[in-house]
């Protein structure tokens, strides 16, 4: 029998619980070009110092756990740990702080938004020492950006595919969103496209339900696209929603869209998941399909000011995962979107290099190192009277999507599409002539309506419609 081993106090590693800030709060740390940087809005529980709370965020989203473990000695914590390197109080709030955390690049799998989010916005958001936690922004270093394919094609390639330049693109979501048969659905698509729209769209919750199976919808929509193209001489598209219960089924639907020769498919990237979205994005690039992204479920994640993830982070994640369009709010319609905040993440979607600008909620300078851009889609409660503001706010590289603002026209879908196209062309021409859309917008629409009975009828229907609620998420 082997002799009993005596355990002496003080030998081996020192077990027990110690303050996170002793290891993970490092105010003297100089960030590296390869670090992923995060800005968290945190609300500590009463009695928890902000330094301890910030260090806890850094620890629990990287290498730390609640107690010292002996396997800490088998690796280099200094190399792999996250570091809370700065904390600043939030102006106007009693117990709220912005904690800045730096993460070494080696903590994350290359080309995986799924792995990135699993760490940075994982279990730490349920940590008891925090009353609330929100990820406000991420700085993605060029070294990590280069591991992603990004959008299947990007803005310039899409314009070349469509042969459409110098103006925003026009779209429409087919309504009612649920309940139409495939044939009636295709008829609605055709009427909108022949009236002058560039795209029509499946609603986000149109997948493959008993009233309209996906294959039937794809066929009737393809017929509508080809017929409208033949009549107008323009390239048309319909966002065929490939979102499905499994990745295999999703890719099967995308493959069928490719066989039909249509230009674009669609995915609900948050409900579908980043792994599925990245897989579909790769398929779309390999097979020449554009990819429209809907952000269903985003408000569950980003609408509360103190807890969750800001949409600018979700937008950056989408640009890495891949998508050629994404819904971004309207500023002027029925859905959430404060102007400066919205324009901040619109720039993060489209531009190659974006400077830090706290007035627009951009916490870090972001260099996308030529990753293709994403077209923002303005959609939700917009109509012809909004056209000047939308053209001025979003510029040419955008998609303006009028659902009820097309299909609600008193004369039908095609006249509704005509009204929107005439309004857009009038606004673009006025802007190119140097007129101020913000000041003269209503007059520009009225002048155009004199020569377009369809636009005049639309102006009359929606002259009193306004959505004047204050945005919840402001700077």
From Swiss-Prot:
<feature type="binding site">
    <location>
        <position position="204"/>
    </location>
    <ligand>
        <name>Mg(2+)</name>
    </ligand>
</feature>
<dbReference type="InterPro" id="IPR036376">
    <property type="entry name" value="RuBisCO_lsu_C_sf"/>
</dbReference>
<feature type="modified residue" description="N6,N6,N6-trimethyllysine">
    <location>
        <position position="14"/>
    </location>
</feature>
<feature type="propeptide">
    <location>
        <begin position="1"/>
        <end position="2"/>
    </location>
</feature>
<feature type="binding site" description="in homodimeric partner">
    <location>
        <position position="123"/>
    </location>
    <ligand>
        <name>substrate</name>
    </ligand>
</feature>
<dbReference type="InterPro" id="IPR020878">
    <property type="entry name" value="RuBisCo_large_chain_AS"/>
</dbReference>
<dbReference type="InterPro" id="IPR017443">
    <property type="entry name" value="RuBisCO_lsu_fd_N"/>
</dbReference>
<feature type="binding site">
    <location>
        <position position="173"/>
    </location>
    <ligand>
        <name>substrate</name>
    </ligand>
</feature>
<keyword id="KW-0120">Carbon dioxide fixation</keyword>
<keyword id="KW-0602">Photosynthesis</keyword>
<feature type="binding site">
    <location>
        <position position="295"/>
    </location>
    <ligand>
        <name>substrate</name>
    </ligand>
</feature>
<dbReference type="Pfam" id="PF00016">
    <property type="entry name" value="RuBisCO_large"/>
</dbReference>
<keyword id="KW-0150">Chloroplast</keyword>
<comment type="subunit">
    <text>Heterohexadecamer of 8 large chains and 8 small chains; disulfide-linked. The disulfide link is formed within the large subunit homodimers.</text>
</comment>
<dbReference type="InterPro" id="IPR020888">
    <property type="entry name" value="RuBisCO_lsuI"/>
</dbReference>
<dbReference type="InterPro" id="IPR036422">
    <property type="entry name" value="RuBisCO_lsu_N_sf"/>
</dbReference>
<dbReference type="GO" id="GO:0004497">
    <property type="term" value="F:monooxygenase activity"/>
</dbReference>
<keyword id="KW-1015">Disulfide bond</keyword>
<keyword id="KW-0456">Lyase</keyword>
<dbReference type="GO" id="GO:0019253">
    <property type="term" value="P:reductive pentose-phosphate cycle"/>
</dbReference>
<keyword id="KW-0488">Methylation</keyword>
<keyword id="KW-0479">Metal-binding</keyword>
<keyword id="KW-0503">Monooxygenase</keyword>
<dbReference type="InterPro" id="IPR000685">
    <property type="entry name" value="RuBisCO_lsu_C"/>
</dbReference>
<protein>
    <recommendedName>
        <fullName>Ribulose bisphosphate carboxylase large chain</fullName>
        <ecNumber>4.1.1.39</ecNumber>
    </recommendedName>
</protein>
<dbReference type="GO" id="GO:0009853">
    <property type="term" value="P:photorespiration"/>
</dbReference>
<dbReference type="InterPro" id="IPR033966">
    <property type="entry name" value="RuBisCO"/>
</dbReference>
<keyword id="KW-0560">Oxidoreductase</keyword>
<feature type="active site" description="Proton acceptor">
    <location>
        <position position="294"/>
    </location>
</feature>
<dbReference type="Pfam" id="PF02788">
    <property type="entry name" value="RuBisCO_large_N"/>
</dbReference>
<feature type="binding site">
    <location>
        <position position="177"/>
    </location>
    <ligand>
        <name>substrate</name>
    </ligand>
</feature>
<dbReference type="GO" id="GO:0000287">
    <property type="term" value="F:magnesium ion binding"/>
</dbReference>
<feature type="modified residue" description="N6-carboxylysine">
    <location>
        <position position="201"/>
    </location>
</feature>
<feature type="binding site" description="via carbamate group">
    <location>
        <position position="201"/>
    </location>
    <ligand>
        <name>Mg(2+)</name>
    </ligand>
</feature>
<comment type="function">
    <text>RuBisCO catalyzes two reactions: the carboxylation of D-ribulose 1,5-bisphosphate, the primary event in carbon dioxide fixation, as well as the oxidative fragmentation of the pentose substrate in the photorespiration process. Both reactions occur simultaneously and in competition at the same active site.</text>
</comment>
<feature type="binding site">
    <location>
        <position position="203"/>
    </location>
    <ligand>
        <name>Mg(2+)</name>
    </ligand>
</feature>
<dbReference type="GO" id="GO:0016984">
    <property type="term" value="F:ribulose-bisphosphate carboxylase activity"/>
</dbReference>
<feature type="binding site">
    <location>
        <position position="327"/>
    </location>
    <ligand>
        <name>substrate</name>
    </ligand>
</feature>
<feature type="binding site">
    <location>
        <position position="379"/>
    </location>
    <ligand>
        <name>substrate</name>
    </ligand>
</feature>
<feature type="modified residue" description="N-acetylproline">
    <location>
        <position position="3"/>
    </location>
</feature>
<keyword id="KW-0934">Plastid</keyword>
<keyword id="KW-0007">Acetylation</keyword>
């Amino acid at each position: 029998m082997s002799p009993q081993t005596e355990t002496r106090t003080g030998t081996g590693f020192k077990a027990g619980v110690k303050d996170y800030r002793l290891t993970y709060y490092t105010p003297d740390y100089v960030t590296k070009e390869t670090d992923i940087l995060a800005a968290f809005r945190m609300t500590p529980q009463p009695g928890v110092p902000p330094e301890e709370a910030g260090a806890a965020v850094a620890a629990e989203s990287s290498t730390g756990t609640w107690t010292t473990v002996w396997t800490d000695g088998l690796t280099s914590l200094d190399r792999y740990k996250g570091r809370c390197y700065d904390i600043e109080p939030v102006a106007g709030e009693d117990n709220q702080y912005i904690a800045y955390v730096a993460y070494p690049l080696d903590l994350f799998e290359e080309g995986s938004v799924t792995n990135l989010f699993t760490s940075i916005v994982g279990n730490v958001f349920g940590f008891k020492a925090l009353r609330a936690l929100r990820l406000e922004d991420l700085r993605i270093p060029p070294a990590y950006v280069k591991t992603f394919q990004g959008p299947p094609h990007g803005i310039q390639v899409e314009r070349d595919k469509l042969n459409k330049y110098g103006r925003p693109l026009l779209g429409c979501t087919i309504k009612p969103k649920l309940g139409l048969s495939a044939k009636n659905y295709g008829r609605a698509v055709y009427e909108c496209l022949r009236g002058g729209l560039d795209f029509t769209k499946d609603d986000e919750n149109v997948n493959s339900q008993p009233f309209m199976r996906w294959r039937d919808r794809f066929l009737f929509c393809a017929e509508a696209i080809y017929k409208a193209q033949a009549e107008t001489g323009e390239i048309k598209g319909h966002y065929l929603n490939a979102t499905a219960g499994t990745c295999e089924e999703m890719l099967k639907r995308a493959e069928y869209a490719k066989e039909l020769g249509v230009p674009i498919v669609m995915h609900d990237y948050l409900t579908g998941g980043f792994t599925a979205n990245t897989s579909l994005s790769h398929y779309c690039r390999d097979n020449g399909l554009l990819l429209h992204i809907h952000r269903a479920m985003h408000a569950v994640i980003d609408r509360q000011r103190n807890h969750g993830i800001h949409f600018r982070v979700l937008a950056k994640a989408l640009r890495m995962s891949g998508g050629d369009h994404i819904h971004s709010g309207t500023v002027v319609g029925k859905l959430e979107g404060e102007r400066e905040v919205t324009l901040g993440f619109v720039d993060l979607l489209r531009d190659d290099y974006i400077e830090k600008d706290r007035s627009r909620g951009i916490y870090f300078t972001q260099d996308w190192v030529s990753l293709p851009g994403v077209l923002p889609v303005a959609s939700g409660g917009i109509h012809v009277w909004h056209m000047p503001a939308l053209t001025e706010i979003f510029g040419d590289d955008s998609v303006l999507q009028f659902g009820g603002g097309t299909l609600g026209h008193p004369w039908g879908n095609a006249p509704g599409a005509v009204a929107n196209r005439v309004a857009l062309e009038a606004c673009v021409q006025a802007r190119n002539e140097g007129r101020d859309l913000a000041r003269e917008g209503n007059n520009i629409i009225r002048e155009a309506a004199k020569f377009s009975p369809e636009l005049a009828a639309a102006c009359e229907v929606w002259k009193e419609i306004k959505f004047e609620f204050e945005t919840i998420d402001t700077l």
